Amino acid sequence: MPLFALGINHQTASVALREKVAFSADLLLDAYQALLAQPTVLEAVIVSTCNRTEIYCHLKQDNCDEVIKWLCSFHQIEDHKLRPSLYCYSEYQAIQHLFRVSCGLDSLVLGEPQILGQIKQAFATAKQAKGVDKIVQKWFQHTFTVAKRVRTETQIGANAISVAFAAVCLAKQIFSDLSQSRVLLIGAGETIELVGKYLIEHQVPNITIANRTLSRAMALVEQFDAQAITLGEIPNHLAQADIIISSTASPLPIIGKGMVERALKARRNRPMLFIDIAVPRDIEAEVSELRDIYLYSVDDLQGIIEENKQARQVAALEAEKIIDGCIVDFISWIESLKAVESIRTYRQNSEQLRDDLLNRASAALQNGEEAENVLKELAFKLTNKLIHHPSLALNETARSGNDDELILLRNALGLSKKD
């Protein structure tokens, strides 16, 4: 039952190559139609993110050359340009790879949770495209169970290891319920956008975005249902903010001690948290001298991040142990399918034998033969035919001298040691 995981990721391929092999959402259904039309492809799921493009598939044969050729053809890229960056795992390694990817163990940021959501979406799209049947369905269901176990039983996602995530986690430590907090974000770059996404995940209802140009801020306003202001308007809004997170490219501080003093007075000294993740700093260091002010710099966050990286490495080792056990469980299920097929065939053969003998017996009765004789002959022939192959197997096994196999065969036939 050949299972494969093939593709490229941030570890094996440049951004330029990953862009060429990425599947845009509007082309995915066409891609599935073409992929599933390949003679050897039984089932397939395409996972395409900014950091990886992978195909998880169930094939008729024991190599994935046809899928690789299709991938090159679909994206119009020459084979020799893709192969050096391509990995192709089969069976145990393929199962392990999907489990590790879903748990964030193969991500650029160790343990990041977004990849699981992306895999779930990819699986849903594959089902929509008729790319999923029994084997891949079970594979991915098992994958989601593994990822849930890893998240529940380890601390893989509990410790922030990105500046943006660390900033939000720090805010949550100081203001335990962020859903009651007002947040001012200063800047509109990638880091602030990521901070905004994490804040939304924590149900922060009131976000204001301050930026030098309103046009860039407006893009985030729509994304986060926020309010936009210019940097010059910050003094008028600062007192309303409980949490201020700043990340701009300004060469000079944007917030000074005097501005914060006035805001504190207007707030009647209710605490304020300032997180400055800009270099050079956006907030004057003297702000930390004020009472009821918590000021953290990017260096403070880096210290937290380094500690958390070590904690995640420990959690990753625990996750690998869980994954190893789950691989064994899934492979056992796959192996059990072989028995299911054998049982089905054995039953079909037995039923066919029964039907043939019944038809002969019925014909004999219609020809006027004695019912008792017909039944005796039916029972005799049925018994002989049913025990014929097991008897041959017992004889051959006994002659081979393989006692373990003989015991196994006897147990399968329901024979006790005394028989």
Curated annotation (Swiss-Prot):
GO biological process: protoporphyrinogen IX biosynthetic process from glutamate
InterPro entries: 4pyrrol_synth_GluRdtase (IPR000343), 4pyrrol_synth_GluRdtase_dimer (IPR015896), 4pyrrol_synth_GluRdtase_N (IPR015895), GluRdtase_CS (IPR018214), GluRdtase_dimer_dom_sf (IPR036453), GluRdtase_N_sf (IPR036343), NAD(P)-bd_dom_sf (IPR036291), Shikm_DH/Glu-tRNA_Rdtase (IPR006151)
EC number in record: 1.2.1.70
Gene3D superfamilies linked to this entry: Glutamyl-tRNA reductase, N-terminal domain (3.30.460.30), NAD(P)-binding Rossmann-like Domain (3.40.50.720)
Pathway assigned in UniProt: Porphyrin-containing compound metabolism; protoporphyrin-IX biosynthesis; 5-aminolevulinate from L-glutamyl-tRNA(Glu): step 1/2
Site (described: Important for activity): H97
UniProt xrefs under CDD domains: NAD_bind_Glutamyl_tRNA_reduct (cd05213)
Active site residues of this protein: C50 (nucleophile)
Recorded catalytic activity of this chain's protein: (S)-4-amino-5-oxopentanoate + tRNA(Glu) + NADP(+) = L-glutamyl-tRNA(Glu) + NADPH + H(+)
PANTHER family linked to this entry: GLUTAMYL-TRNA REDUCTASE (PTHR43013:SF1)
The protein's name: Glutamyl-tRNA reductase
Organism for this UniProt entry: Psychromonas ingrahamii (strain DSM 17664 / CCUG 51855 / 37)
Lineage, top ranks: Bacteria, Pseudomonadati, Pseudomonadota, Gammaproteobacteria, Alteromonadales
